[in-house]
Amino acid sequence: MSDLRIAIVGFGKIARDQHVPAIAATPGASLVAVASRNASLPGVPHFRTMAEMLRDGPAIDAVALCMPPQVRRTEAAAALAAGKHVMLEKPPGASVSEIAPLVAAADKAGVTLFATWHSRYAPAVEPARQLLASRRIEQVTITWKEDVRVWHPGQDWIFEAGGFGVFDPGINALSILTRVLPQPLFVTKADLHFPYNRAAPIAADLDISDMDGLPIRAEFDFRQTGPQSWDIRFDTTEGPVTLSLGGAKLFDGDTLVVDAKDAEYQGLYRRFVDLTSRARSDVDLAPQLLVADAFTLGQRHVVDAFEHKAEVKA
């Protein structure tokens, strides 16, 4: 069987750092084009827009859409209408309701729509799910704090309406949470902290639960400097189970159970190749529904202005 010929649309940091090496490392996948207004990749055909690429570019089977979520829906719809398989970076769209028409369009065209959650493919996530299946969980604490200036340098879109703000990384934690816990979850309380010069939150504190009343506390913050925190602690009757470093490590109490190399995006592309071989879609909106809950229920708090270039004090 020939390789799945993939084009990347939107060639920013995540595409360059994660998608390109993952495609290169995935059997049955090859990168044949890039569409981006501002960036290119040596040795790969480049086009300024996806429309130009579809019209004048090489034969492609699929597109990986890596542009900001605010503009993803229209590009996804155009690619599906052209009969191309579509991979959506997370979050799949700027809103929840805009995804259903894309699912219908993929079904009608007989192609794959894959809404990706890369953190679910972290090496410790599935072992954690299996371990927790035999435990009674009493409470969950999520601490997901990072420095936006390091991970999204100069990317103003992330603080625009529809850019998700701190929920751009925070949704990674929610994607893990909704994978490892067996019951549907919902937000019961949210405090959202908006810089007074921005349209999306820079920090958020959430209370989440399930129908059995499991208490889950999530703290997201884009202002953390120094060591970064991507941890989920499950307190069980048999002791704590902790996912750390975004799901790279798993601790059962003090015992390190999993400590593996990151291969999240390779996992995504293996899944994409498999889905496209069967023209099947994979669209789970549970993580984004929790974000929508947070914006619906959230109390807004105004905090200091944010600029990507930190103020230098004399």
Predicted regions mapped to residue ranges:
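Beta-loop-alpha module in the N-terminal Rossmann-like domain of NAD(P)-dependent dehydrogenases
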Residues: 44-105
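Predominantly a Rossmann-like dinucleotide-binding segment in NAD(P)-dependent oxidoreductases
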Residues: 119-188
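Contiguous beta-strand/loop segments that form the cofactor/metal-binding neighborhood of enzyme cores
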Residues: 174-247, 270-280, 296-299, 312-314
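Conserved acidic residues
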Residues: 32, 61, 138
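N-terminal Rossmann-like dinucleotide-binding module
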Residues: 1-43, 271
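Active-site loop of classical SDR/Rossmann-like NAD(P)-dependent oxidoreductases
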Residues: 14, 242-244, 257-270, 283
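Rossmann-fold dehydrogenase core element
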Residues: 100-118, 136-140
